[in-house]
Each structure stands twice: as C-alpha cells, then as structure tokens.
Design a protein with these regions (language model features):
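N-terminal secretory signal peptides
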Residues: 28-86
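Bacterial N-terminal signal peptides
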Residues: 12-22
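Bacterial N-terminal signal peptides that target proteins for export
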Residues: 2-13
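Thiol/selenol-based redox catalytic cores and closely related redox-interacting motifs
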Residues: 88-152
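Sec/Tat signal peptide C-region and signal peptidase I cleavage site
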Residues: 23-27
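General N-terminal leader/first-domain-start detector
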Residues: 1-2, 136
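Acidic helix-start/capping segments at beta-turn-to-alpha-helix junctions
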Residues: 59-60, 95, 156-157
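N-terminal targeting pre-sequences for secretion and organelle import
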Residues: 144-166
Length: 166
C-alpha cells in the first residue's frame, strides 16, 4: 500500500505541476487577435504593420483597442473619453504592451519602460517596454536611454516630452 502511494505521488505531482504551468501560459495569452482592420484610436495608423510595438487595452465589457506603441496607449489611458467617447479609464480590465526583446504581449502594469533612447517607434520617440529590469537596463545602456520607469511613474508630461523630441 505504501508503494502505491509513492507511485501515485510520482505520477500525480508532475501532472499537477504541468497543469498549473499550462494554465498560467494560457492565462497570459491576449484575449483578442490583431487584424488588418484594427486602427490605433489615437493616431489612426493600422496597427498590424507594427507587431514589435503593439499595445492593447481591453475593457470590462469585452471591447478593446490596439495601439501602434505604448506612447499612444498611455495617451488613451490619460484621456480615455477623448479617444473613445462613452468609455472611461475606470472600466479598463487589462492593459498589454509588447516586450521589445521577446516581441510578446506582457502586462503593462508590471513592465519596465525605457525612455530617451536612440530607438524610434512608428510615431517617433517611444517608451520601450520590457518584462524585467535587467533587460530594460541592458537596452538603456546599449541605446543611450535616459531612464527606466514603471507604469505608475508614466505621466502625461512625460508623454508630451516624448512628442516634443520629434
């Protein structure tokens, strides 16, 4: 009987761990796929042309908007009613940005953003998102970045300063 419990644990534990990992991976998938019709509500550009720069906001009612960079996503976030009348920032469910190195959507609220670098996005000077501080620091050093910000540190004034650099 004791051997049976050991065998059960040796089989069930890996299956359980694999299930948890798979559930975590599936939970990280974006809720919608980008199409050729999706346009940035801030600048009007077709977003599918810029996969390295895509950002995404999903609302509680399932509505969503893609952006051609984190900068336009923040502009929308700071003035939701202007870019999407009838919506408010309080009804946002999820926000994603694309990790610059991995080109995968990541949670915008946990990302690290490099500003002031020599790399330009589709709309000029951009915030470049990274999933971890180490990657952001490496990029900052390689591309003459000025600083690394967290989501809550990005302000309308910072976004305006990026636009003025153009």
């Amino acid at each position: 009987m004791k051997n049976f419990k050991v065998i059960q644990m040796r089989v069930l534990l890996p299956v359980l761990l694999l299930s948890l990992v798979a559930a975590n991976i599936w939970a990280a998938d974006p809720p919608v796929e980008i199409t050729k019709k999706d346009r940035c509500p801030v600048c009007g550009m077709f977003v599918y042309k810029y996969p390295k720069w895509v950002a995404l906001i999903v609302f509680q009612d399932g509505g969503y908007y893609f952006y051609d960079g984190a900068k336009d996503m923040f502009k929308h976030l700071f003035n939701t009613a202007k870019y999407t009348p009838g919506r408010s920032a309080e009804t946002i469910k999820e926000i994603y940005v694309t990790d610059y190195y991995d080109v995968e959507l990541i949670d915008a609220k946990t990302a690290f953003y490099v500003i002031g670098s020599d790399v330009l996005g589709p709309m000029g000077h951009e915030l470049l998102p990274f999933k971890d501080r180490e990657s952001a620091q490496e990029f900052l050093e390689d591309h003459k970045g000025k600083s690394i910000l967290r989501f809550q540190e990005v302000t309308p004034a910072i976004i305006e300063s990026l636009d003025r650099r153009q």
